[in-house]
Amino acid sequence: MALEIEARDVIKIMLQFCKENSLNQTFQTLQSECQVSLNTVDSVETFISDINSGRWDSVLPQVSQLKLPRNKLEDLYEQIVLEMIELRELDTARAILRQTQVMGVMKQEQAERYLRMEHLLVRSYFDPHEAYGDSTKERKRAQIAQAVAAEVTVVPPSRLMALIGQALKWQQHQGLLPPGTQFDLFRGTAAMKQDVEDTHPNVLTHTIKFGKKSHAECARFSPDGQFLASSSVDGFIEVWDYISGKLKKDLQYQADESFMMHDDPVLCIDFSRDSEMLASGSQDGKIKIWRIRTGVCIRRFDAHSQGVTSLSFSRDGSQLLSTSFDQTARIHGLKSGKLLKEFRGHTSYVNHAIFTSDGSRIITASSDCTVKVWDSKTTDCLQTFKPPPPLRGTDASVNSIHLFPKNTEHIVVCNKTSSIYIMTLQGQVVKSFSSGNREGGDFVAACVSTKGDWIYCIGEDKKLYCFNYQSGGLEHFMMVHEKDVIGITHHPHRNLLATYSEDCTMKLWKP
């Protein structure tokens, strides 16, 4: 059952924040536009005491921020004017009588009452009986204090900050926010350090070891940079702390060893753009959608007749694009749980697919050596092209395609050759990068740095190749694993790479 919160209460919390931080103009504007009154004081007892003692210099600033019934406000201001006349503070009495809005309204609607104060003001003496009638000054104060106090309440100070603090503590308690983590309140995520300069990693920081009979088939960083997830041939999906290289035990389900998992090897994973959901695809053609914070499976799809080779969320997180060994790409609806679109036309495995940045097209890469561009709504194939063949002349399987950050109409195409290409969606080669290897160095995987300044490729020779976009040259290469490397992924904000291999390890690299 959803917890309902009154909109007026939210406004009052905002008004209190404005009041406590002396944002007086904002306070008045918000109160006027929303027609919501705060009507709080720090202490009712002190407020009553100030009225009973005639400490009007303390009472007036508080009253100016309250919405009181007009008759009670008039009684209060009348009492202040009479007491100022009694003290012969005639300038103050005159200013209140002639310059305040309350007295101005009284002059128009209760002329006789108003003129009585004007007459008392110009007299050379003060007669308490004439001013207060059968009552006394003290009794008048007490009556006003009692009447005004009924209109105000007391709430704890700094409610906005207190509520935010409580929310953050709850997130920590639930394992959603690791202790000691800086939090970006505006974005609603833990604050992440962002590397200013895009540069290639070359130092091994951590080696994550899997079981002797297990290795990672896929790994991905979350878009917010908080998580590194891996999926393995043993069916397990694990979330890692890339800073320590250890399993994230602040996720309670992992601390309890209740891991996300499939019955078959998990070949691919992908995060939603808000980093809240993780999709996983397995060798038996099934897809599962998980809540990354809780490890709860929220949706299952019998998506393909054969293994799922790649997954990609739509920008708004409402759809999931999948590819398979069954030669198709498909779009699934997360809310409906149904197949929405199917893309047929490849004659071999579809290895990878992505949405274009505006979501209007999808791009697929296949072992039939082609890249296809499709209309995501009509499923029409708009373009089919092949990357340039290797020097030996035969076409090569296309492993993956990647959006290029520097131009949304360009893609990075990795096929099983020793070259990688930046191409247009019409199939024209914009730029190419080559390792120079004639044999044994064909690329099996690739990724692009956040800003697009570096393109990273993994070769069959177990080496990482780092290409500089500006120079077009191979700036660095190094051996990264002892056995065949399966894939590579780049952190969204940091100069950090993760590589994973059949040697049962995943390695983290930084500059």
From Swiss-Prot:
WD repeat start and end residues: 211-252, 261-300, 303-344, 345-384, 393-434, 480-511
Give one Pfam family: LisH_TPL
| Alphabetical keyword list | Acetylation, mRNA processing, mRNA splicing, Nucleus, Repeat, Spliceosome, WD repeat
Q: Domain named LisH: which ranges?
A: 6-38
Residues bearing PTM N-acetylalanine = A2
| Signal peptide limits | none
Instruction: Write out the similarity annotation.
Output: Belongs to the WD repeat SMU1 family.
Q: What is this protein called?
A: Suppressor of mec-8 and unc-52 protein homolog 1
Q: Which gene encodes it?
A: SMU1
